[in-house]
């Protein structure tokens, strides 16, 4: 499973493929959906990307990819369920390996970041599993917003995976550091490389030099691109269901991102996975949630925030409500739109 632009033929294939996945009676598909916690009718692109895909990929990351072929070609429901459960176990194992490497990589990144002075991050460790370094690189970019290379070494031989940010062409960056690499490939935002341990420091210095020459100060802060500014009175089931027509969302067809300025925080609750709010604007009050946030996230009761969000329908106890999934927020200023 991989990520591709969801435009043109790709989007058509995915729309039809999601229908096939939802209706398929193939034992392997049924079993994979079962262990992934997907039940009921429709299958979404998000469920493919975050539930089915990781279990398919986990086989090749920690075991052998042929298991996926066996799963999808068997006519036996019993065999399919056994293999699907194995893939689910591999995915849990992959997540454990990812957590271990991510913890070490975050420590290195925090030490190297130097208060934002670095324009790039090259992180490495002995024994870091090659099956998870790409995921770890993505997590580091999410946290620090720098072109990031994560390398796992085994007896002096390193395999690296990299992720980039807007304005820095990764493979072009590698090309300018090619004297330190055994081989490399990829595209603008993702790539891979092979490197010897003795070349690690020279490569990191050269890569940082290229990043400094390429990226200005404004490039080092993530840009939130808003599709439309809305008042809460414009937000409801009608809009949410019109957006359904635009699905499936993904690369090349991103889910619309909205912004409401100066929303008043009525309630706020921090919970293990993030922060929940009740926000009020234009005479309407809506629920909102941001995942992965903590006590320091903007917006205390009584304050006003500018909030960027996507829409979702939240079903609970048999009732539905439109909820805001917060992407970014900042304290509202007098100059807010």
Task: Specify the residue positions occupied by each region the protein language model found.
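Hydrophobic helix-and-loop "lid/oligomerization" segment in the mid-to-C-terminal part
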Residues: 1-199, 229, 269-271
